[in-house]
């Protein structure tokens, strides 16, 4: 039962018990706030899925030119840190992988929109051109000199070897006046 049906049901029960319509519209008693008359929309309410709204923030961000993020997994093996990012429909030339100062991995790029051919009629376009960026601070044992990246079947895999010989560097800092 939808929320609207249950609200309307409470209103009808209150009226049957002699509470009147009550609420803000005046009818006395009842104490319930009368819902806006939405019974005309009731048949459509169950068809609206909350998952349809889940994509709205990213669609709005893309329309505003705000970069989206790529879904990414990070696993650590004995020898390396391995990052796997979903890049469906992205070509190698459209992705940039870099390690910034202070060991920050940055994946960025732009997914190109398919060119419209003359004589074609599009019925729906959801895969628009969009920029994406993802940054991850790497752990101290990441050896950024040996980074390897590969794009295969829409998955970008970045392997960063571990520097297992590196010991945490601790030092005493002198205090000056």
Swiss-Prot record:
Record domain sHSP: where: 63-177
Assembly and binders: May form oligomeric structures.
GO cellular component: cytoplasm
Transmembrane segments: none
Chain residue ranges for the region called Disordered: 1-35
Keyword Cytoplasm: yes
Domain of life: Eukaryota
Family: Belongs to the small heat shock protein (HSP20) family.
Protein name: 18.9 kDa heat shock protein
Database matches in PROSITE patterns: SHSP
GO BP field: protein complex oligomerization; protein folding; response to heat; response to hydrogen peroxide; response to salt stress
